[in-house]
Amino acid sequence: MVNVEEPVLYAALATDIITELKQTSIEIKDVTVSFKGAKGVYTAIKDISLEVKKGEIVTLIGHSGCGKSTLMNTISGMVKPTRGEVIANGNVIKGPGPDRGIVFQNYSLLPWLSVYKNIYEAVDSVMKDKTAAEKRAMVQSNLEMVNLLPHKDKLPGQLSGGMKQRVAIARAFAINPSILLLDEPFGALDALTKGSMHIELLKLWNLDKRNKTIVMVTHDIEEAIFLSDRVVVMNDGPEATIKEIVNVNLPRPRNKKDITHDPEYVRIHDKLLSLLFNKFSIED
């Protein structure tokens, strides 16, 4: 006998999932950031508005000095907007918070602590309501996810660049932030290590992609396309603004070997090249 309620239940569940995925994770509203210096006031970014949906991966791309990191720092809470506001998960950002994990290019690991303790310190400072056993389990789980459990007792100075960045990513994920901010995290890595880190990042995101929003700063067009749902192209500073937002309509999961032959990938790649480098073209 067919249960007539099942289609209704499935439809309701699908509606709930779609609604959840459409929720806004980050809202940047008319944000301007200016700094006072010896030569007067320097406006890094001006009148920027952007919404990032829950579960999205969005990259910020542009030339050096276009305000990418400044915009990222307003989301992290380390830079306060001169005008406008940034909202994360429905709350106006007043400063850094555990709902936003950050990974920098320079790893930012404590050199005197082991891999394990670097992650444990972060978990211990955020997860006040957890027991010591629960915290240890969280650290171990995240080390396993980035394949670093055998290296848990090593100091950062004993690790390669790629391994250090995996520690930094594991530390960020261990505190279970709903928003992960990546400021050129793979910029100093060689091409092979960078490629493997992309896969590691997407695996971690995929475990909780309905709840994990990622915003990343990069100079790498290929990286932006491979990882992103949308690419935000910034104009040059000062007074940098958003030049254009490019949708990346490529199915997931993505394979680096196959994706570059996809006509849509080629179209997006050419579009980003045009937006970023047209002014440097040489005419005959």
Language-model-detected regions and their locations in the chain:
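Helix-to-loop junction immediately C-terminal to a conserved catalytic motif
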Residues: 76
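The feature captures the beta-strand-to-loop junction immediately N-terminal to the Walker
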Residues: 61-63
